[in-house]
Design a protein with these regions (language model features):
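Feature activates predominantly on carbohydrate-active enzymes
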Residues: 255-502, 687
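Short, compositionally stereotyped local motifs that mark structural "simplifiers"
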Residues: 730-835
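Short acidic, flexible loop segments centered on an aromatic residue
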Residues: 37, 54-87, 128-130
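Active-site neighborhood of glycoside hydrolase catalytic domains
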Residues: 460-583, 589-595, 600-602
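Acidic, contiguous N-terminal accessory segments
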Residues: 22-23, 125-268, 272-300, 556-564, ...
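Asparagine-centered strand-capping/turn motif at beta-strand->loop junctions
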Residues: 48-56, 471-473
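Flexible, acidic glycine-rich loops studded with aromatic residues
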Residues: 554-771
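Low-complexity, acidic Ser/Thr/Pro/Gly-rich terminal tails and inter-domain linkers that flank the onset
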Residues: 22-41
Length: 835
């Protein structure tokens, strides 16, 4: 009976196509979710596919291809004559249509199926559709849309309502500007008594500090109307004074009635003083007021204040990375971890190995991946530009390193090995096949990364079965050494030392190498490797020798220091015998309830220098609630801006309000390890991350970058929050809410309007407002007080010309009210409906 239903749907589609107007405007692929069957973790969905090409799609010759992080078709529910294939990864899917599925141009095919898995967000659903026509050997990329709001069972998703958000924002209220910070991250000490001076043109001197005068002049001038000069023929009204009592990055900034003074011991401190001054002057101009007469004494809490940008999953070019560096410098971050490779992309040009970027730098339709990688994360057929394609040239990388150095930022190259290496493996396999075809086996095997005879079986965290390098062949180490040395050469061209090299090494699945003939021989002939379980540690020591030989220090994710076992991401045991490697772990996997919340403290207490990269606090792609329209992931929980801001790096258990919300009691906390006072020096700092699986446009990238980067900078630089010293959740909550309200106001009223004017601007997040109607009165709130809220009563989506919400207003109970947040430029966010 069920199959008859689906066959009838197919028959119906043919009847529908006869009525379809050839000129009707339509989105080629409509994916309609008919039912969310939450109890059974299934969905009933309907595909509507329109041939929008000028060529007939003859049955038996065409197939539909797409990616979807969640959702796998239940084969038994497919219409007869339709074949489903899961290819690999997370996820590349294909439907091949049999002989009776003939679609002329503008014809439409409609059929229904069931899927395993509930799509938690649109960004994790189907995307990147294209049709491959095997007869014409062409691909047609198809625009798509997901329709879901009228699905049965939608109430089971617990989607946040306008009223829910209104409650979430209940502790937020608009503050007067004299209660707001002039500088973020908040300086260690500041004295402002409410007095102002008149603005004036600036003429500064650097008094011998090794900073490029034109660079400071240009940077300080950005966004300002006053003139900035450094002219010895004029009187100086901004003086820089050397103060050797200050630490390297510390500074004093004093704005007086007639002059400005900066004190520092090193150029880094001078630079950060100018960044603080820049913020103050920009805010003063935006608010059309004088300059505050203020004294600031400032120094960072942590030496390492990092941001990692993933350009491997989805690629963003040099120009975007330079803009990121500008914003990092503004907020006093000093380490840029550039993730250049992963399973889904190789993004750095390497001389002598063109396959890395020709194959590994592109995704799209392929029969054997000798020309490019399979589509992933909505990259489409590859015949059009997409964020799945692209790479940095060597010169691009040199310019990035130089640009960063000028802004007191160190660039750290991240080249994943031996895990998350699928792009490199496939590229070198293409090289192998090409040279083998012409009989040059020496060249074919020189940089080989796979064992063709390996029968090992595994699935990585992203569901790949072939993303781990065969580390039992000299060719693998020859390859990695070449990469290290070629990247070192780029640093030399940038006149900058390569101090650190990141091997990644996260999420190594259990199972590789166990059935590899190469590895069996390698272990049998090497007394330093007793068993296959010892192979990975031996590999790490070889990598360390290569990296230290290049004058750098080896760093990577903490996974490399944990026992490689069937426990995989649940493993807790530390490999203390690797302490002599001087390896710095970036400790990321601390999901609440996962058992590794205290891992960084355990590592530091054992003597490892470590950096906190907490997924439950500092991953910008973690969404904040169940909203279907959010971009990002939630595997490490739902993380709000307030959660990130409220994280105490030296003791993640100190925020009692957060523990209470998570249901974590004191007995559970008592089982965890805390950072010992004598190990505090091993805690080097913190790093934020932006992974790009769901980031398919610059707009999405910007919305996840900002204001996350600003919030993170507060934790990286500013002092510990005073409310954390209070003993209980009950005591902490009012103080926490008050402090967050002050910070959120500083974001909404000052920082977000300011960054709109800097470095080309950024489309920062505009959170959905919250609202209720109580006794015919509309009440609205927003996450960042100071941003505008506009509304309509006629059912139309609000624009920048719509009425501005300023106070509660009377509304008709029968009206459908649309509400939307706006920034200072008039750009609007997503709208909500209040009934």
């Amino acid at each position: 009976m069920r199959m008859k239903k689906y066959l009838w749907a197919v028959l119906a589609c043919y009847l529908l196509t006869q009525c379809q107007s050839p000129n009707s405007e339509t989105i080629p692929v409509i994916f309609t979710i008919d039912t969310f069957d939450v109890p059974n973790n299934q969905m009933e969905v309907t595909f509507s596919i329109t041939n929008n090409s000028n060529t007939p799609w003859e049955g038996g010759t065409w197939s539909l291809h797409w990616n979807s992080i969640f959702g796998e078709i239940i084969i038994e529910t497919l219409p007869e004559g339709v074949e489903y294939t899961y290819v690999d990864g997370q996820q590349y899917l294909i439907l091949a249509f049999g002989e009776k599925y003939n679609l002329k141009p503008n014809d439409k095919l409609i059929f229904s199926v069931k899927q395993k898995g509930i799509i938690p967000r649109l960004a994790m659903g189907p995307m990147g559709f294209f049709v491959h026509n095997d007869k014409t050997k062409t691909n047609t990329d198809l625009e798509s849309k997901i329709i879901w709001k009228n699905a049965k069972g939608i109430e089971g998703l617990n989607l946040p309502s306008a009223a829910d958000r209104y409650t979430t924002y209940e502790t937020l209220e608009l503050l007067s500007k004299d209660q707001l910070d002039w500088v973020i991250p908040t300086p260690e000490k500041q004295n402002f008594n409410g007095e102002y001076r008149l603005p004036s043109a600036l003429n500064f001197e650097l008094n011998g500090f090794k900073i490029d005068t034109n660079f400071i002049k240009t940077r300080l001038q950005e966004g300002l109307t006053i003139k900035v000069n450094s002219d010895e023929k004029l009187d100086y009204n901004l003086s820089v004074i050397k103060n050797n009592s200050l630490s390297e990055e510390a500074y004093k900034l004093i704005i007086l009635e007639d002059k400005i003074k900066i004190e520092a011991s090193e150029s880094a401190g001078i630079f950060y003083a100018f960044e603080s001054l820049h913020q103050i002057l920009l805010i003063a101009e935006n608010e059309e007021k004088g300059w505050p007469i203020i004294t600031i004494e400032d120094t960072p809490r942590f030496k390492n204040r990092g941001f990692m940008s993933d350009v491997a999953r989805n690629f963003y070019p040099k120009e975007k990375l330079l803009q990121i560096l500008d914003y990092m410098a503004l907020y006093k971050l000093n380490r840029f971890d550039l993730k250049l490779t992963d399973d889904d992309g190789w993004r750095i040009e390497i001389p002598g190995l063109p396959e890395l970027t020709q194959v590994g730098g592109n995704r799209g339709y392929t029969q054997d991946e000798n020309d490019r990688l399979i589509p992933m994360y909505g990259s489409g057929s590859g015949d059009q530009d997409s964020s799945g394609n692209g790479f940095l040239t060597g010169q691009d990388f040199v310019e990035i390193v130089q640009y960063a150095k000028e802004r007191n930022i160190e660039v750290i190259p991240q080249i994943s090995f031996p895990s998350h290496a699928r792009a490199a493996i496939k590229a070198m396999k293409a090289r192998y096949d090409n040279f083998k075809a012409i009989g040059n086996m020496e060249a074919a095997t020189k940089y080989m990364l796979h064992d063709p005879e390996d029968q090992s079986q595994y699935r990585s965290a992203q569901l790949y079965s072939d993303n781990v390098v065969c580390i039992c062949d000299a060719s693998a180490y020859r390859f990695y050494k070449k990469i290290i040395l070629e990247i070192k050469t780029l640093y030399e061209k940038a006149d900058t030392p390569m101090k650190v090299f990141n091997i990644g090494a996260d999420e190594l699945p259990y199972g590789p190498w166990q059935k590899s003939p190469k590895c069996a021989d390698y272990i049998a002939n090497n007394k330093a490797i007793p068993t296959v379980n010892d192979l990975y540690n031996y590999n790490l020591r070889l990598l360390n020798t290569m990296i230290t030989g290049a004058g750098a220090r080896m760093v990577g994710w903490e996974d490399a220091l944990l026992v490689h076992s069937e426990n995989e991401q649940s493993e807790l045991n530390i490999k203390e015998d690797l302490l002599d490697l001087d390896f710095i772990p970036y400790v990321w996997n601390n999901s609440w309830g996962g058992g590794r919340e205290d891992m960084i403290y355990r590592l530091a207490n054992k003597g490892f220098k470590a950096i906190m990269s907490n997924s439950s606090a500092f991953y910008f792609d973690m969404v904040d609630d169940y909203d279907m329209e959010n971009s990002g992931m939630s595997w490490s929980g739902y993380v709000t801006y307030k959660d990130s801001w409220g994280t105490e790096p030296l003791n993640v258990f100190a925020n009692k309000v957060k523990l209470q919300a998570l249901g974590i009691d004191e007995a559970t906390v008592a089982t965890k390890e805390f950072l010992k006072p004598e190990a505090k020096g091993n805690f080097l700092g913190i790093q934020s991350q932006l992974w790009t699986e769901t980031i398919t446009s610059e707009e999405i990238f910007d919305g996840l970058l900002m204001p996350n980067l600003i919030v993170f900078s507060q934790r990286a630089w500013a002092a510990k929050e005073p409310w954390l010293e209070l003993p209980s959740a009950k005591d902490q909550k009012p103080a926490l809410d008050k402090a967050w309200n002050q910070f959120a106001n500083s974001l909404g009223q000052r920082q977000l309007p300011m960054i709109n004017k800097l470095f080309g601007g950024v489309e920062h997040d505009l959170p959905k407002p919250g609202g209720i109607i109580d006794q015919d009165t509309l009440y609205l709130r927003q996450q960042f007080p100071g941003l505008e809220i506009r509304y309509t009563l006629d059912g139309i989506k609000p624009s920048k010309e719509s009425p501005l919400y300023e106070k509660p207003l009377k509304v008709s109970i029968n009206k459908t009210i649309h509400v939307r947040g706006f920034d200072a430029t008039g750009r609007g966010g997503k709208s909500i409906i209040i009934n």
